[in-house]
Amino acid sequence: MAIFIDITEWNEIRYFNTKGTRNKCVVRNPLNDELYFFKTSIQKDQKDYKTEFWSEIIASEIGNALGFNVLKYDIALHGNEIGCISKSMIGNEETLVEGISLLTGYDNTYTPESKDSYSEYTFQFIKKALNNFDLDSFVDDIIKVIIFDSIISNSDRHQENWAFIAKHME
């Protein structure tokens, strides 16, 4: 069950940059020094989707109830903004490799920002890229993501919102 956390006094890490359409920031819990991601709802074309962040919380609760390996999301207050918060899924020695890096590394002609490439973004394409990098053991995880997205009616699984955790290398 999601809990409410006031993170107003937590330290915002301004040098972290996260992708996506929503306003978000990275904060550090002063009690345990762990990083968390705080997301608010989006405001678009003079429309305010104030309750949009709840979809993250509800998806998290459904995923956990069904036994999927999903992040836990809670409700958070950051100053005068309400949103959702999740603990960082990576440790200090790890980094996220987004799907877009994997796919463009496999096929450098693939241009996800071009509408002409939309039809190329398929399970088969992802599977070929995984096989190319000897990551075929993750095919079952991709299938689980597709099943979970179907259950929660997520139609926004683009290349920048799935990733692999890798050891950080300089």
Task: Describe each model-derived feature in a short phrase.
Residues H158-E170:
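Catalytic activation segment of kinase domains across protein kinase-like and atypical kinase folds
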Residues S153:
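Residues in Ca2+-coordinating acidic/glycine-rich loops
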Residues M1-Y110:
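Conserved ATP-binding subdomain of kinase catalytic cores across diverse folds
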Residues F68-D74, V139-D140, H158-Q159:
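Short secondary-structure capping/junction motifs at helix and strand boundaries
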Residues M89-I146:
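ATP-dependent phospho-/nucleotidyl transfer catalytic cores
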Residues Q43-Q46, Q124, Q159:
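Residue-identity detector for glutamine
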